[in-house]
Amino acid sequence: MRALHKELGNAVDVVRFKWLEAKIAQGHGELGSAEAAFCEVRDFFVERGISHDVAQVSLDLGTLYLRQGRIPELKKLTTDILALFVNLGIGREAIAALVLFQQAVEMEKVSFGLIRDLAVYLKNARNNPHLPFRPSSRA
């Protein structure tokens, strides 16, 4: 399947397929290979300035870090995402959502629910930059 995808797809499609493979690896507990793939995918999107995908894959990586209790790495990751969004001039609402997330990480109060809510929000905010972030009460 991967060979066919590489043959028929463009570079972004191939990287998105790798991202999917990373999610599957994470689900199967192959955390080392998942982390390496998430980082590779993230670097690809950073190089091309595809900010929302950088944030999404970073949140996947953040979930992995949280699951492993790697809070220092999660803190650095959130700082990097926020800096990228500020540098790219991403909408105020998305930046405000990321600041809230960063504060939760810094206070070590972040949850899987908050990461999930932020991922859903960023996906929706991509086409509606004025959409406010409202985390669920279970986050």
Segment roles from a protein language model:
Residues 1-7, 12-24, 101-109:
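Alpha-helical scaffold segments of alpha-solenoid architecture
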Residues 2, 32, 42, 81-82:
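Intrinsically disordered, low-complexity coil segments
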Residues 40, 47-139:
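C-terminal non-catalytic interaction modules
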